[in-house]
Swiss-Prot record:
It comes from Microcystis aeruginosa (strain NIES-843 / IAM M-2473). Its main location: cytoplasm. This is Serine hydroxymethyltransferase. Keywords: Amino-acid biosynthesis, Cytoplasm, One-carbon metabolism, Pyridoxal phosphate, Transferase. It comes from the Bacteria.
Length: 427
């Protein structure tokens, strides 16, 4: 997205231009703490808003069903080569439109309807696509679930092994949407081998940390790895499938196209290539390390202020606040922090007595605001702001002061200062 493109948009469709302007301002004025969100670079947005959006390209590089794909092939092959280098994969498919699409392509390859899959309970930090009854994964397959220990709130690998021995799943899924500790992929491999299961890692949340060595890499231990390309990887919204097994990789390719998708979104694939190129640079490794340092600073300060952190801390980019410690629900906290321009999301905590629509938790993450340049000092201040508002929900004067502190942080670390959207006045 460039100023030129925005100028054209403001002239041809001022209504949409106006909406974009409002959203840009919202992003600039808020502390974005949703763990699954990030701010892409201007280069990623430029690729995604490019002429590649005009081209159909069913198939793979050098194996297309349409003519005129020679430059599309170059862009997609560059994305493939870069991501294989980034993660150490032997095979990669960069075409899935989303992480959910990537997961379903894997299921289509490895499973038949009625087969048993084993993933983490959604309420413990799993994901909808890992067997939730409201998702196709929970409708087409027999699902068994594992969770965390009631005492430590961490993965209990002995219990996971016991469940696997009893249920004999065909596929075991590890990788989560709300788990703040490192995953031992080697232990999962041993469990899968004992029961004869495939092992899949969904690293959508931690991909950027894996790419830079700040989290163990699942590829040496898993049959297949899926991920989104946004979140900690800081690319466009999309999905990705990787494996060390090239023959299995060819089967995944067929499950993406023609199995679950038609034409790929090659403008998004090009944006993925840009993001993978950025992630290969030394600066991105520094960024990933700062993401973790900032998350730990935030969790530490909230804990110091008396707010319970699930698992008592974090090893990655996110944390879960158990708000029973302050007599509040996740829904209430979500609404409360939004009044001071902090964006977060309510989330279940392990063994949560509340419904998923209310919850006892609030999920926070550091990737987006780390991208804006905030460091540990600023995240400690964010921790104090959040603690102040959660511990004093009825103090209007304090709420006003907290909103001003948020505004000061946002002004000190501007977002996309080069972007300007001028919207003509409507008659």
């Amino acid at each position: 997205m460039t100023d030129t493109n925005l100028d054209i948009l403001s002239l041809t469709d001022p209504a949409i231009a106006g909406i974009l302007q409002k959203e840009l301002q919202r992003q600039r004025d808020h502390l974005e703490l949703i763990a699954s969100e990030n701010f892409t670079s201007a280069a990623v947005m430029a690729a995604q808003g490019s002429v590649l959006t005009n081209k159909y390209a069913e198939g793979l590089p050098k194996k297309r069903y349409y003519g005129g794909c020679e430059y599309i092939d170059e862009a997609e092959q560059l994305a493939i080569d870069r991501v294989k280098r980034l993660f150490g994969a032997n095979h990669a498919n960069v075409q899935p439109h989303s992480g959910a699409q990537a997961n379903f392509a894997v299921f289509l390859t490895l499973l038949q309807p009625g087969d048993t899959i084993m993933g983490m309970d959604l309420s413990h930090g799993g994901h909808l696509t890992h067997g939730s009854p409201v998702n196709v994964s929970g409708k087409w397959f027999r699902v068994v679930q594992y969770g965390v220990s009631p005492e430590s709130e961490r993965l209990d690998y002995d219990l996971i092994l016991d469940i696997a021995r009893k249920e004999k799943p065909k596929l075991i899924i590890c990788g989560y949407s709300a788990y703040s500790r490192q995953i031992d992929f080697e232990k999962f491999r041993a469990i899968a081998d004992e029961v004869g299961a495939y092992l899949m890692a969904d690293i959508a949340h931690i991909a950027g940390l894996v790419a830079t060595g700040h989290h163990p890499n699942p590829l040496p231990h898993c049959d297949v790895v899926t991920t989104t390309t946004h979140k900690t990887l800081r690319g466009p919204r999309g999905g990705l499938i990787m494996t060390k097994d090239e023959e299995l990789g060819k089967k995944f390719d067929k499950s993406v196209f023609p199995g679950t998708q038609g034409g790929p979104l090659e403008h998004v694939v090009a944006a993925k290539a840009v993001a993978f190129g950025e992630a290969l640079k030394p600066e991105f490794k520094i960024y990933s390390g700062q993401v973790i340092a900032n998350a730990q600073a935030l969790a530490g300060q909230l804990k110091a202020r008396g707010i319970k952190i699930v698992t008592d801390g974090t090893d990655n980019h996110l944390m879960l606040l158990d708000l029973r410690s302050v007599g509040m629900t996740g829904k209430e906290a979500d609404r409360l922090v939004s009044t001071i321009n902090i964006t977060a999301n309510k989330n279940t905590v392990p063994f949560d007595p509340e419904s998923p629509f209310v919850t006892s938790g609030l999920r926070l993450g550091s990737p987006a605001m780390t991208t804006r340049g905030l460091g540990e000092t600023e995240f400690i201040e964010i921790g104090n702001i959040i603690a102040d508002i959660l511990l004093n929900p009825g103090d209007e004067a304090l709420r006003t002061a907290c909103r001003q502190r948020v505004a000061k942080l946002c002004e000190s670390f501007p977002l996309y200062p080069h972007l300007h959207i001028s919207v003509p006045a409507l008659a």
